[in-house]
Amino acid sequence: MKRIDIDDDLYTYIASHTRQIGESASDILRRLLDVNSSEPEADSKSEPTESVFNRLNEQDVRIQKSVVARFLYILSMLYRCHPSEFSQVLDIRGRDRQYFARSEEALLTSGNSTNPKQIPDSPFWVITNTNTTKKKAMLTQVAEKLGYQSADAEKIRDFL
């Protein structure tokens, strides 16, 4: 998948021709141009099923009032894009504690100052009592676990 920059008026035009929620810009353009996909389906399996960049934008992130709120918002967008793969984040751990779990209790057992919070609209919990640098590192690890290339993982991290 390639990324291109387009003018706002073209973006608005493409977005106005969306037929269903979650339809990608590529699908809309193929339909508008009456072009079939030239890529075989097997190749698309190496890329994430849906890109978080289709849902996540700077303005939405900046509305969140704190670093923790932004952190949880970004994680929730990653979960929404990759719900079936998200359980892979359970493998992300620190030296002495677990970072992600399916329950608050599981995180509390790995430390009494973890301040666990539920990732919105997901069954997963994450520790939030870390500094911003550690939260950025965690976001990078999550993105890489979900199949994003390093450059895209860094872009996701930089939303924080």
Swiss-Prot record:
Cysteine-cysteine disulfides: none
Top-level taxon of origin: Bacteria
Alphabetical keyword list: Cytoplasm, DNA replication inhibitor, DNA-binding
Cytoplasm in keyword set: yes
A Pfam entry, by short name: SeqA
GO cellular component: cytoplasm
GO terms, biological process: negative regulation of DNA-templated DNA replication initiation; regulation of DNA-templated transcription
Classification via InterPro entries: Arc_rbn_hlx_hlx, Ribbon_hlx_hlx, SeqA, SeqA_DNA-bd_C, SeqA_DNA-bd_C_sf, SeqA_N
Family under the similarity heading: Belongs to the SeqA family.
Subunit structure: Homodimer. Polymerizes to form helical filaments.
Function comment: Negative regulator of replication initiation, which contributes to regulation of DNA replication and ensures that replication initiation occurs exactly once per chromosome per cell cycle. Binds to pairs of hemimethylated GATC sequences in the oriC region, thus preventing assembly of replication proteins and re-initiation at newly replicated origins. Repression is relieved when the region becomes fully methylated.
Protein name: Negative modulator of initiation of replication
Species classification: Bacteria, Pseudomonadati, Pseudomonadota, Gammaproteobacteria, Alteromonadales
Gene: seqA
